[in-house]
Structures are given as C-alpha cells and as structure tokens.
Amino acid sequence: MASEFKKKAFWRAVIAEFLAMILFVFISIGAALGFNFPIEEKANQTVGRSQDIVKVSLAFGISIATMAQSVGHVSGAHLNPAVTLGCLLSCQISILKAVMYIIAQCLGAVVATAILSGITSGLENNSLGLNGLSPGVSAGQGLGVEILVTFQLVLCVVAVTDRRRHDVSGSVPLAIGLSVALGHLIAIDYTGCGMNPARSFGSAVLTKNFTYHWIFWVGPMIGGAAAAIIYDFILAPRTSDLTDRMKVWTNGQVEEYELDGDDNTRVEMKPK
C-alpha cells in the first residue's frame, strides 16, 4: 500500500478525479439551477417541468460521458463514491486509492458548488442543487429510490469496464452517461436524484442543510456495493478467495484475465 502511495500515476489519478469532479458538478448542477418549478400543476406548467427534467438528466449524463472520455485513461473517471466503492469491492482498485478518490471527489464537489454559488448568487430560491425528499415521499421510500438508481448505474459501470470482456461494442463512456441520465429521469421527482454522495455533499455543505443528507450517502453506497457483489460473485464470478482479494486491496489493480464461458469457473486475481 505504501509503495502505491509513492507512485506518480497514483497522484495523477487522484488529481484527475478532483478536477473532473469540479467540471462535472459545475456543468450538471449549473444546468439545473434557475429552474423555478411551479407549485400549481397546470397543463402548460407540467410540460415545462417535464422539459426541465429532461434537460437536467441529459446534462448529468452527457457531462459524465465527457469526463469519462477525457480522464478515464488516467483515473477511471469514477466521479462518484458509490462507483468507487463498487470498483473496490470488485477488486479493481486498492483501499488506499478508494479512500483518496472519495476525498478528491468530495472536495471537487464542494469547490464546484462554491463556484456556482458565486455565479448564481442573484437567483431567487437558489438551492445549489440540494437533494431532498419531495412532498409525500418518506425517508424509507427515498432511500429505496436511491438504492435502486445507483444499483443500475454501478452495475452498468462494472459490467462495461470489465477487462475480461471482449464483447463490449460502442462507447463505454456513452453507456455510463446514459445510465446516469436514466437514473435522473427516474429519481428527480422523488429525491432530486442524488445517486452520487459527493455531488450531494457539495450542495449540503454550501447551503448548510443536512436534512435527510444521510439518505444520499447510505442509499447510493448500498446500491453500489450490492451491484458490485452481485456482478462479481453471481453474474461474472471471479475468485472467492479472500486472501487473493486482500492482496489486490493492498497492492493495487489486478492483471487482465479472460472471462471463461464456464459458469462454475472462478478467475484468479493477482496483484501487479
């Protein structure tokens, strides 16, 4: 673990997560700010709200796809603690790198939200993209929504980035971006769609409002962990040997292996 800490590539990856997170949050939350959703649901207002939801969803999805294409080769472009946790559990990164990524993501989100706070200071009712529960949505329901939308995102990420596969066609960043957009189309009306604890953290810090903030950490982390475990142990199994996993978690990324067609085969993992 100490040897990885000294590598330049390690710090380049952490810096890439920080900078890409700033751009992602600035673009996506910036697209959402200024939309004053009406209280009364008249016909023309409902159409306007639907259009705004599509705008925000596309902004989140396209910005993630853009950042993934830009820095994916440097850091993997996680840009989400839930994705980082999923990659950790599927033995794609070490524990040290996961911790540093999450710190970088949270700091990047705070910086981006602070920039937006200055730029949009003249907006009325400026929530800075703060996540919260819609009227009539309970904490348990909101938690369930966050778990499910993050589950589909992390399942997509670990599946399309599985280096043992050779059947992935098309653009991987685009697939992940569409998954992010899909999650927002589903969840915006219920929770504002967190699906990303760091993104939610930035807004909560700048607005000093942590009401129900735990939902936007617990939900995505449960969803991300569940997706990685189900993919890694059921859908496309690797080794179940804890010793091998511990070596990867302490020494870094694993080598590439072929995904055997036999459902009963476990793929051995070794640290580089």
UniProtKB/Swiss-Prot annotation:
Domain of life: Eukaryota
Motif NPA 2, residue range(s) on this chain: 196-198
Family named by the database record: Belongs to the MIP/aquaporin (TC 1.A.8) family.
UniProt note: domains: Aquaporins contain two tandem repeats each containing three membrane-spanning domains and a pore-forming loop with the signature motif Asn-Pro-Ala (NPA).
Function: Forms a water-specific channel.
Annotated coiled-coil segments of the chain: none
A Pfam match: MIP
Residue ranges, Cytoplasmic side: 1-17, 72-97, 161-168, 237-272
GO cellular component: plasma membrane
SUPFAM superfamilies for the chain: Aquaporin-like
Site (Hg(2+)-sensitive residue): C193
Glycosylation sites: N44, N125, N209
Positions of transmembrane segments: 18-35, 53-71, 98-119, 140-160, 169-188, 215-236
Organism of origin: Pelophylax lessonae
Protein's name according to its UniProt entry: Aquaporin FA-CHIP
Keywords per UniProt: Glycoprotein, Membrane, Repeat, Transmembrane, Transmembrane helix, Transport
UniProt gene name: AQPA
Position of sequence motif NPA 1: 80-82
Extracellular side: 36-52, 120-139, 189-214
Cellular compartment(s): Membrane
